[in-house]
Amino acid sequence: MVKIVDHGTWQLADADEELHTRGPGLLWNESFYFDFAAPDGSIGGYVRLGLYPNWDRAWYWACIVRPGQPAILVADNSAALPGRGSTDLRTAGLAAKQEIVQPLRSARIGLDAVAVVLPEAAAAYAGLEAAEQVRLVLDLEWVTAGGVYPYKDLPRYEIPCEVTGTVSIGDATTTIRAFGERDHSWGERDWWQISWLWSSGRLGDGTAFHGMQANIGFAIGWPSFAVPPSGELSHLTGFCAHTDFGADGFPQRSRLRLPGAPLTAIPLAFAPVAMTSPDGRVAHFPRALCEFTADDGRIGYGWTEWNQPPGWRDHGWSFLGDSSVADADLAGRGGDGK
C-alpha cells in the first residue's frame, strides 16, 4: 500500500488521478506534470499538460535536455482541448497520450511530435517558426517510489518516481532508467501575478527531495518532503530558498534550505517556455535540469523552475522562512546568498 502524507486538511484518493469538475475562473486549469533526470545528469526531460476549459485551450510542453547540447522542445499554448473525460491530445504537430496505469502508483506518457531544436535557451522566448525541426518520440513510465505528497492547503500532489522507457530524437533512441517526479493540480493559477521556485531531485545516495516557495513577501509552511534511501516519504518543516539571476534573466543558482540537507542548485541545461495571458501580459518560465550539491558533499540531479511574471525582479527571491536559519546560512557563505 502506497504511503500518502496526511496533513489533516483534505484527503487524497485514487479518484483524484482523474479529471475534476471545472471551477468558475477564466484561469482555472488542471495540470499534469512529469519529469525525469538520469542519475549522472546526462539527460533529463519533462512533459506538462495544462487544460483550460474556461479559456477553451490546452497547453502542452515537452522538452529533452542534455548538458552542452541543444534543447529539444515542444511548446503549444493554443491546442484544442481533449475530448470529454480524456487527457489525450492530438494536433497537427503532436499526438500525446497520458495513462494512469494504477492510481497513485504508476503512469505512462506517450508522445510523437514535431519538436524544435534550440541551440540557445533564450530562443524559446521568441518565435519558433523558423527553428530547425526534429521528430521527438517519448514512451515513458513513472512508478511511485516512496509515497505520495499532497500539498496541505492546495488541491495538488507530488509523487517521487522511478522512470523507465525510451526517448527518440530523430533516428537516435536512448533508453531511460532515471528518477523523477510527477504532479497533478487543479484550481485557478495566475502565471502573470505570482513568482515562485519549485525544485525536485535525487541525491547520489538515493535521497529524494522536493521544496516549493512562492514570493509572497512573508513566510508560511512551504511544501517540502524527503524520501530516504529505500525509505518512505515524510513531510519536512522549514524549507525556503534564495535565487541569484543573471542580467539575461536566467537563474544562475539557487540556495535551497532543505531541512537536514541544505543544497545548492546549479542549472545545467534550460528548458524554458513563454506564456501570454488573455490580456497580453507575458511570463517567462526558465525550467532547468540542475545539479544539486548538498553541504555534506552529496551530489544529485533533478529539476528546478522559476516562474517570472511581469515585474518578477522586484519580488524578492530570497529566503521566506525561519530568519535565524536563513541569516546563518548567508553568514556562513559570506553574506552573498550564493
Q: Residue ranges of each PLM-predicted region?
A:
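Structured soluble/peripheral alpha/beta segments that form catalytic or ligand/cofactor-binding pockets
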Residues: 1-338
